[in-house]
């Protein structure tokens, strides 16, 4: 059974921070689709989310009568609903980040991992000035942002490593570190820049600076 998704505590603050920023308008759904394809087909996106490619990209829906834009896992294919007033590059990016994290059920929908990815994507696809405005708005509205992703030996990016460790005490993880080492166990502590996992009687103490990927393992929380 997958772990229960954490409470989406900063959702409203994220919305308040993003709303004034605007962004280039995309008047029609084909315009939105062209921007979606530019993002998902870019080297930047492929390097970070190789399993989320153009063939699997969300279908765009007009949202006639809908009051807001939203991402949804519909049967057979994900969708993004875009009412006319929400057809901007900023909104499309926001919803694409939800798609990138669709399988991350152990992370909040608008948590630190989400805001870090959106901040990085804003810099890449909307420019550094817009990125700085978004970063300032996050600070103003007390939105928490995760640290940069860790990059593994093969060049893969892990954005969720920090938030998983932050929220995951008592959960089982598979932690990859150094060039080719890994350890599995229940997270006991994260202190003094070290992560401690328990696997039966064994204890794994891993320097945090060496970690490049953290994945859930087993069946969620251990029995208490």
Give the role of each language-model region.
Residues 84-89:
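Secondary-structure capping and boundary motifs in well-ordered enzyme cores
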Residues 90-103:
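Active-site recognition of the HExxH zinc-binding catalytic motif
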Residues 94-96, 129, 210-212, 219-222:
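Surface-exposed beta-strand edges and their flanking turn/coil or helix-capping segments
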Residues 7-81, 103-213:
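Metalloprotease/metallohydrolase-associated module, dominated by Zn2+-dependent proteases
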Residues 1, 166-167, 217-224:
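Short intrinsically disordered terminal tails
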């Amino acid at each position: 059974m997958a772990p229960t998704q954490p409470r989406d505590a900063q959702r409203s603050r994220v919305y308040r921070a993003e709303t004034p920023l605007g962004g280039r308008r995309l008047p029609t759904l084909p315009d939105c689709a062209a921007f979606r394809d530019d993002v998902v087909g870019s080297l930047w996106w492929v390097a970070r989310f190789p399993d989320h490619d153009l063939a699997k990209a969300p279908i765009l829906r007009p949202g006639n009568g809908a009051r807001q834009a939203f991402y949804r896992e519909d049967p057979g294919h994900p969708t993004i609903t875009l009412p006319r007033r929400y057809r901007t590059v900023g909104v499309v990016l926001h919803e694409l980040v939800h798609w990138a994290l669709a399988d991350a059920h152990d992370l909040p929908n608008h948590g630190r991992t989400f805001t870090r990815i959106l901040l990085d994507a804003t810099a890449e696809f909307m420019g550094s000035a817009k990125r700085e405005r978004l970063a300032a708005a996050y600070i103003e509205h007390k939105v928490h942002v995760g640290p940069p992703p860790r990059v593994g030996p093969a060049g893969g990016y892990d954005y969720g490593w920090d938030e998983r460790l932050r929220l995951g005490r008592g959960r089982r993880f598979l932690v990859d570190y150094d060039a080719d080492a890994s350890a599995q166990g229940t997270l006991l502590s994260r202190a003094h820049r070290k992560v401690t996992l328990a696997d039966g009687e064994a204890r794994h103490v891993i320097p945090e600076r060496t970690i490049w990927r953290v994945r859930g393992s087993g069946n969620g929380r251990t029995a208490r």
